[in-house]
Structures are given as C-alpha cells and as structure tokens.
C-alpha cells in the first residue's frame, strides 16, 4: 500500500488540530472523573498543556507560512507554498521543487535534510 504524502504546512496544521481536540477530550475525561480529585487535576493540566502546545504550534505555523515561497503548481494551476527544497502542492499533491538540480528526480523528503558531509 502506497504511503499517503501531504504538504508540510498541512501536516503541522493537522497535528495542531489534533492537539486542540485531544486536549479538550482529555479535559472532558477529567470532568467525568471528578470524584477522583487527583486524577481530575492531572487530566485537566495535561489537557491544558495540549491546548497550549497547539496554540504555540499554530503560532509557529503562521510565522513559517509567511516566509514560505509562493509558487503556482504546474499540475492544477493553483498557488501553493513551498517549504524547503522539495514539497507537495497543497491542492493536488504534485511534487514541487525550488532546486533546479532536483528537477525530474523522484520525490523524496530526504532532500530537505541537511547532510553532515560537505557538498561536492
């Protein structure tokens, strides 16, 4: 089965949304267990920290999104943001690159990672 690929900004947004709803569910679980005060307090704090982490992540996504290069996807013709050397179109998952050396090569997330070796 082929692994589904997603745009980097959308993956971060999905994680932040999971943290918000997960935090609310954890806090709701704390309310259901209010007869056990220690467990309730722990669940409320964990849920609150999850919501705070989500807020920080949304803030970082916003900062990163403003610095991303905006390009027009050659496949669907819509504007999308590219983070790093390679990324996927937000609309049609078309592989995009800003590096001319990577044009025509198979899409791989490893192209965005910095290697410790000196470039040749």
From Swiss-Prot:
Top-level taxon of the source organism: Bacteria
Alphabetical UniProt keywords: Cell membrane, Membrane, Transmembrane, Transmembrane helix
Any one GO cellular component localisation term in the record: plasma membrane
Pfam families the record matches: DUF2614 (PF11023)
Subcellular location: Cell membrane
Database matches in InterPro entries: UPF0295 (IPR020912)
Transmembrane segment boundaries: 16-36, 41-61
Keyword DNA damage belongs to the record: no
Topology with respect to the bilayer: Multi-pass membrane protein
Family per similarity comment: Belongs to the UPF0295 family.
Name assigned to this protein: UPF0295 protein Exig_0660
